[in-house]
Amino acid sequence: MAYSWDNRVKYVVRYMYDIDNNGFLDKNDFECLAVRNTLIEGRGEFSADAYANNQKIMRNLWNEIAELADFNKDGEVTVDEFKQAVQKHCQGKKYGDFPGAFKVFIANQFKAIDVNGDGKVGLDEYRLDCITRSAFAEVKEIDDAYNKLTTEDDRKAGGLTLERYQDLYAQFISNPDESCSACYLFGPLKVVQ
């Protein structure tokens, strides 16, 4: 149940983009993402220029997401609307065939997780990313998920490259197979209520 396609898409909305935790996506979430991304990129330092750039990116992203997913045009994208948009625009497709808004989502997420900026998401960064969304009694739970997610080649390379991350993210939101390795992209999942 936790790795079902339905739950994975709910998870993306709830834990990745509904920053203000009101149960839906709206313009405010993307304004908050601009602040968050600026601070993450600056490793805690706030650059007005970087913020202005992130504001522009996030405003454009919200406008594109609203165009793709706000079917009733009320200024809010519900979980159901987001699921419909994913089904319509992403399901069964590779990353390269996704709409621009989804690609920006994915690139920004990679940038936020790649804390050391080496172009790879290693086990240490994966652990840090996982604990920002869920509680774990043992680190082994996270490590086991990382090992299910990654291949031997990924681990030899020092982690997931951007290209590999893009492919896994595309599978996470578009592949209905509950046993695909991409199900572990954001760690051990819980059922989203």
Curated annotation (Swiss-Prot):
Transmembrane segments: none annotated. GO terms for molecular function: calcium ion binding. Residues 16-40, 57-92, 101-136 form the EF-hand domain. Ca(2+) 3 binds at residues 114, 116, 118, 120, 125. Pfam families: EF-hand_5 (PF13202), EF-hand_7 (PF13499). It comes from the Eukaryota. Expressed in tail muscle (at protein level). Ca(2+) 1 binds at residues 18, 20, 22, 29. SCPs from crayfish, lobster, and shrimp are polymorphic dimers; three isotypes (alpha-alpha, alpha-beta, and beta-beta) have been identified. Like parvalbumins, SCPs seem to be more abundant in fast contracting muscles, but no functional relationship can be established from this distribution. The sarcoplasmic calcium-binding proteins are abundant in the muscle of arthropods, mollusks, annelids, and protochordates. This is Sarcoplasmic calcium-binding protein, alpha chain. The lineage of its organism: Eukaryota, Metazoa, Ecdysozoa, Arthropoda, Crustacea.
